[in-house]
Amino acid sequence: MKKNFYTISKTMSRSLKLILFSVFIGFSIFLIPQPTWAYPFWAQQKFENPREATGKIVCANCHVASMPTRAEVPQAVAADSVFKTVVEIPYKKDLQEIGADGSKVPLQVGAVVMLPDGFKLAPQERWTDEIKEETQGVYFTQYSEEQENIILVGPLPGDQNREIVFPVLSPDPRKDSNYNFGKYSIHVGGNRGRGQVYPTGEKSNNNLFTATNSGTITSIETNEDGSQIINLNNEEGESFTENLPAGTSLLIKEGDTIEKGAKLTEDPNVGGFGQLDKEIVLQSKARVIGMIIFFIGVGLSQIMLVLKKKQVEKVQAAEGI
């Protein structure tokens, strides 16, 4: 009996510790923001598929500013082969942005590559020395346990990772009938810098703020955390407040009269998100060999026809025709 009681107590103690640890981790995620959780944590939590029916990648919901992203993908690849998908995220050198605490910080970058079904991140034992060198310091994750064809990277220091190499393994339709040879689409997204909107819909301090009310600014208060409160009075004597996060640069001052919609701050954003689509052909070796044989056959046939024609011309010339 004592033994059973001890076993039950020990089990309950372990369960309680596990629950407390889980709660601690959960609160840590929300109360202690970390750069590595900034992307793509929210997209993974909110969206089963990162690409909407319209074709828009959901990262653009928070990173509303647009900037170009480029990608290099082979035109065709063989089955069960490793190839590189290179995502380029260009921006000006030494560019800095406003961090969540209002301080200036270097830009970070991130990328997502949505591969066709069957394509996935190549296992490390199949990486070449060149790929190992090009991916040093880069950590790859898949969007979910079930979607190994969607690969994510970031956030990473932008000054060192303006070009991100994704090592990809193609499927082999000869071994798995679920996949076929043919042409497929690859969807690529690349981002530099923080988002302008939080997943909750609220603006981040990396955004332009406008007045929600008209009136005269009576005072501007600055809190300990750097956030600011703009106090206004309108012509009817009503009082309003505008709350601004830390790090914003004001365009207004005490005593100014502003209209609803007027700019209160400068637009601090220097980053942006971009996406594009690429095509790739999963090539069958048998088809390639068959095509080569076909072209050789056609070429030989043409040569034989030319030789035959010359032979006929010689015979006709000899007979005086």
UniProtKB/Swiss-Prot annotation:
It comes from the Bacteria. It is found in: Cellular thylakoid membrane. Its cofactor is heme. Gene3D superfamilies: 2.40.50.100, Cytochrome f large domain (2.60.40.830), Single helix bin (1.20.5.700). It is a single-pass membrane protein. One of its GO terms (cellular component) is plasma membrane-derived thylakoid membrane. Pfam families: Apocytochr_F_C (PF01333), Apocytochr_F_N (PF16639). HAMAP family: Cytb6_f_cytF. The 4 large subunits of the cytochrome b6-f complex are cytochrome b6, subunit IV (17 kDa polypeptide, PetD), cytochrome f and the Rieske protein, while the 4 small subunits are PetG, PetL, PetM and PetN. The complex functions as a dimer. Component of the cytochrome b6-f complex, which mediates electron transfer between photosystem II (PSII) and photosystem I (PSI), cyclic electron flow around PSI, and state transitions. Belongs to the cytochrome f family. This is Cytochrome f. It comes from Prochlorococcus marinus (strain NATL2A).
